[in-house]
Amino acid sequence: QTGKDATIVELTNDNDGLGQYNFAYRTSDGIARQEQGALKNAGSENEALEVQGSYTYKGVDGKDYTVTFVANENGYQPRVQS
């Protein structure tokens, strides 16, 4: 879809308001993203948000690339797959 605006063709979103959430979307140009997060050790001195997810996009070489990740008290930890 070169030169055209992408549109969202699929979307989900849920948040319990207590530290847990998830969302996902897919666009008409093939981009996709999903993520879920949860509060770990709530109320303690070790409380931390842990997020897991992935996103996919088409590179300039025409290949699809997917990045999966975890982000928590140990930082952002991505992995790229093509």
Curated annotation (Swiss-Prot):
Query: According to the UniProt entry, where is the signal peptide?
Result: none
Ranges where the Chitin-binding type R&R domain occurs = 18-82
Recite the UniProt keywords alphabetically: Cuticle, Pyrrolidone carboxylic acid
* UniProt GO cellular component terms: chitin-based extracellular matrix
Q: Does the keyword Cell inner membrane apply?
A: no
Please give the Gene Ontology molecular function terms for this protein. Answer: structural constituent of chitin-based larval cuticle
User: Record's Pfam families?
Assistant: Chitin_bind_4
Give residue numbers for the modification (Pyrrolidone carboxylic acid): 1
What superkingdom heads the lineage? Answer: Eukaryota
Function noted in UniProt: Component of the soft endocuticle of migratory locust.
Mind telling me what this protein is named? Answer: Endocuticle structural glycoprotein ABD-5
User: Taxonomic lineage of this organism?
Assistant: Eukaryota, Metazoa, Ecdysozoa, Arthropoda, Hexapoda
